[in-house]
Amino acid sequence: VKRRIRRRVRRRWMSRAALAGSAAAIVAAVVLVVRQPGVLPEPDAFAQLQQMGVTVERPQVVMTADDGMRLVLENAARLERRSEGEVALRTETGEQRPLATERKLKVEVPNGRQFRLVLDDGSEVWLNAGSKLEYPATFENASERCVRIEGEAFFEIKRDTCRPFCVELGDGECIRVLGTSFNVNAYAGNGRHVTTLVTGRIGYAASAGAEEVVLEPNQQVSRDLAAGTVAVSAVDASVYGAWKEGWLWFENESLPALAERLGRIYGIRVEVAARLGEYTFSGKIRQDRGVEYILNLLSETSDVICKVENGVMRLS
């Protein structure tokens, strides 16, 4: 028997909140005022974790090269093509580091961080927490512009009709574009790879030699890695790229999946009791509000209990 529960919450926390369903299905909707996005999580988010008894050190974004180079970066970097085939890496502080054009680079973004990278062709990549991107120092002499992603990234690709852009996900799985914007979610252990098109058109192939699926804006292709099946569906693409603007946006997402996302965003460990496995939530919250705010919101709109034990956040 379904029942509907309404609880009053503070107006400063949300403009609309609803709780509906049975003990196995809870939906909480949250809408907050848009603010200028910042680096996530912000210092106050780390302070929240300290106050809650969770010790978190600010993790480092690291860029490495196949020749042994290792750089610690902050929030953004840009590859710039110079005269005579030279390439330089410019950091957000203005520091420039010359790079050999044949270098293969990799940037690793740990849990608790995000990073923005401009490639030498002007294409932009936003990397979410817990992600890795492999790419060449320059595409100048390449017939294709190829990169490899593990984790989640949002791409805005500069159009080049002579050189398609290729995003490789492993095992021949590939996305080919000319000029467009799209989100790729390919975290290890998730069991599926999801690509969502925002603008333009992309071609998707699940493996080498497989028939290519062409996506239009607001379409999504999902590959089940265990079953090997591919499905295309219509979605609101803005939901899937909202993270790069500083939003945590979730629709009918299970609490275990949401807890896993919170763990990546804030670099913490979140455990969910078995009884909450089928609870689902929908909402849109600024990530820089901090994890304490988000967990309190879940408690305010449901019977979820949040507590910290031995540095681990437990939801029961």
Which ranges hold each PLM region?
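N-terminal intrinsically disordered, acidic low-complexity segments at the extreme N-terminus
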Residues: 1-3
